[in-house]
C-alpha cells in the first residue's frame, strides 16, 4: 500500500508504470468502441484514476475526446484545464444539486459564489473550455436566486473564455515544483480528497492554490528528471520544494545523490532561486537533515 506522501521506491514506480501501460491499453479499447458508434468519449476525472494519470505520456494513447472533472478550487481547475491531448476540458462547479445544500435554510448561492470566485483566478491563467453543474434539477429549481446567479456565472465565463482562449498569459517567472512525483501528480500535490480542508496539509495545499492563479509558468519536476538532464534547470527561475521532512514532497534520500546536490548548487550559483517550505528533507541514518 502506498500513498502520495510516502517516498516511492523504484519497485513502486515500476509498478505504477505497469499500471499505466495496462490500464490505458484497456481504456483505449473502450474509447475505440465509442468512436465506432460515432460518439465522443469523455472521462470524468474523479476521486480515483489510477493508471489514467492525465499528464503522463500513456494517457495520450487512449484517444479520449474530452475530460470533465469537479472544480473545488483553483488547483483542481488547473488539474483539469492543463490536461494535454484532448479536444476540450470541462469543469463541473459546486455546489452539486444535492440535499446537503439544497434544503430549507440552505444557502446554495453562497457556496456557488465562493466556488466561482475561488476558481476564476485559475481560469485567467488556463481556462477550461466548458462549465456545468450537476445533481437533481428538481432541487435546484426550488431556489430561483441560485438559478439567477448561475446564469450570471455563465455569462461571465463566456466573456472570460472569449478573451483568454488561445492566448498565452503573461508570466513573470518560470517556477518548478520539485518532488518525487513531478507531472504525475501535477496540481495534485498535497491534495487529499477533493479540495477539502485538512489541518495537516492546508498550508502546503495553499501554496499550490496560490500558484494556480499566479503569473508564473508552473512546471512539476522530479529528482529523476534532474538526474536524466541537469541542464533542464537552465529554463527555470525558481525551484520550490514544499512539504514535511520525510515525505515524497521533499524527497528524503534523494538529497544524498551528488548529481542532485551539484545540479541544485550550480542552479543557485548561477542566479536561480531555491525556496524550501515546510521541513528540511530527512535523510535516513543521519541525525541531521539536508541543509
Locate predicted features:
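Hydrophobic targeting/anchoring helices
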Residues: 5-9, 13-16, 22-32, 36-201
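Alpha-helical scaffold elements within enzyme catalytic domains, especially in hydrolases
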Residues: 33, 121, 210, 263-267
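Loop/turn elements at helix/coil->beta-strand transitions in domains of secreted/extracellular proteins
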Residues: 37-41, 127-130, 172-173, 214-219, ...
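A short, well-structured beta->alpha microelement
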Residues: 43-51, 208-235
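Short, well-ordered secondary-structure micro-motifs within conserved domains or adaptor modules
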Residues: 63-69, 230-250
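Short glycine-rich, flexible loops that bind phosphorylated cofactors or substrates
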Residues: 76, 247-249, 283
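A glycine-rich, often tryptophan-bearing local segment used as a flexible ligand/cofactor-contacting loop or short
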Residues: 251-291
Amino acid at each position: 500500500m502506498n500513498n502520495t506522501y510516502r517516498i516511492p521506491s523504484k519497485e513502486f514506480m515500476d509498478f505504477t508504470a505497469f499500471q499505466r501501460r495496462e490500464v490505458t491499453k484497456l481504456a483505449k479499447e473502450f474509447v475505440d468502441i465509442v468512436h465506432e458508434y460515432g460518439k465522443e468519449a469523455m472521462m470524468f476525472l474523479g476521486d480515483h484514476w489510477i493508471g489514467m494519470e492525465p499528464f503522463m505520456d500513456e494517457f495520450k494513447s487512449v484517444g479520449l475526446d474530452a475530460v470533465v472533472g469537479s472544480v473545488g478550487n483553483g488547483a483542481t481547475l488547473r488539474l483539469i484545464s492543463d490536461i494535454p491531448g484532448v479536444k476540450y476540458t470541462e469543469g463541473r462547479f459546486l455546489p452539486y444539486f444535492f440535499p446537503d445544500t439544497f434544503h430549507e435554510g440552505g444557502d446554495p448561492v453562497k457556496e456557488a459564489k465562493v466556488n466561482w470566485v475561488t476558481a476564476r483566478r485559475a481560469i485567467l491563467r488556463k481556462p477550461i473550455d466548458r462549465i456545468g453543474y450537476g445533481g437533481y434539477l428538481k432541487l435546484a429549481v426550488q431556489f430561483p436566486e441560485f438559478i439567477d446567479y448561475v446564469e450570471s456565472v455563465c455569462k461571465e465565463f463566456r466573456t472570460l473564455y472569449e478573451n483568454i482562449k488561445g492566448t498565452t498569459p503573461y508570466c513573470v517567472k518560470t517556477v518548478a515544483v520539485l518532488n518525487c512525483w513531478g507531472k504525475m501528480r501535477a496540481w495534485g500535490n498535497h491534495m487529499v480528497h477533493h479540495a477539502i480542508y485538512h489541518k495537516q496539509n492546508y498550508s502546503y495545499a495553499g501554496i499550490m492554490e496560490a500558484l494556480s492563479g499566479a503569473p508564473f509558468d508552473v512546471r512539476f519536476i522530479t529528482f529523476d528528471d534532474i538526474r536524466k538532464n541537469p541542464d533542464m534547470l537552465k529554463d527555470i527561475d525558481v525551484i520550490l520544494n514544499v512539504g514535511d521532512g520525510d515525505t515524497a514532497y521533499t524527497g528524503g534520500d534523494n538529497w544524498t545523490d551528488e548529481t542532485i546536490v551539484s545540479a541544485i548548487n550550480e542552479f543557485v550559483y548561477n542566479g536561480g532561486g531555491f525556496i524550501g517550505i515546510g521541513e528540511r528533507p530527512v535523510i535516513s541514518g543521519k541525525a541531521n537533515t539536508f541543509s
